[in-house]
């Protein structure tokens, strides 16, 4: 079996011009930057950061964000180099297919489906939670949770997913415009939070900055990290007692808040819909990532300075709005709650786009049924977009948030690891390819990035790893029963095209 067969870059780019499976190029670097900010400034700023401070790192969650930001910022450069060479839908899946082979590409594609399916479901679920919270703060007697006997369903995720699915069916540019307007308003709310929050900061809340490590069972509200199955894998493997705070807490906090930095890899899935992608994709990814890191660092300082991490740990589900409520600024909590509702909505749209483009790329290659990659009159895979929207909505409506969120991180980190490893491989394999952006320090920096990403994976829970392995087993079953035998590369369906045709596919 030819498990490591690879596609050439020329084949990959030429496929973008296939009739009936062509995406429309209408996005600019600014659209990509806003897209990255839209998907990243949401759950991380408004919820995950406060939870990481409460149950993992205390005020040192600032360091957790810094570690996650540095690792992610380094990984973004790997994505930027690949995206400037291969501006095609599929992101890490496509990059891997041209470097280390089909079986690894399948693993990454399957992991990306996990990442974006779980992320889309988590965020749309959070959107419903915070919509109800906003209505409560405003004094409105309304609720999106419906009960039929012992059967419970939250209709809010279904509503928000249906709305953005409809927009994306009618064109990526339309969705990007709506998303952009909402994101600008969201950024304004974030900076409002930072400015107002500084007036409530107390230096005493930063002491101790790194709380001493202690058994998780002794910390009020930390039941989620006390069990064997919920402790970080490396603690389980080394026989350590489940603990929070201290250096282990900073590292596990970094693994948790990494969820906040997943935006740029979703942006890379839109390369095929970008004008002048060799230049605009690296620029859009870089600008977006810089904005994200700055905003997260500022909000982390304000959140931990306003309220003691111990007080946050006493809350069932601490968030940024919780911090303002605890200092008596209920009026600010209402504004923040509105910002959360608005902010999480934009995240849903970008994740729906990214998930669809991953499945689209795998379908076009034949690893998934080819019918999924057909595009309509608007230059979008309309039928696939509707199917993806339906699946995300159903998962969000019926599954618990806690089960889903860590799965996002492990899927993302596994993709980051392989993309980093692929950089030096592609440098040696195809030194002739033009690169609008080059990752500095290859091969050593990409290797260090891969190691750092894998270390963050080891800080995720044992249960997350078990679920991840089960997901991979299901993926291998699909690949060996269908994907391998229907892959266009294996069937000889892919043909090289003249360089003129390739240029037309890229720039047209």
Placement of each model-derived feature along the sequence:
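Hydrophobic alpha-helical segments and their helix-loop junctions in multi-pass secondary transporters
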Residues: 129-136, 185-235, 301-307, 416-433, ...
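Hydrophobic transmembrane alpha-helices that form the core helical bundles
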Residues: 53-54, 63-64, 73-161, 166-169, ...
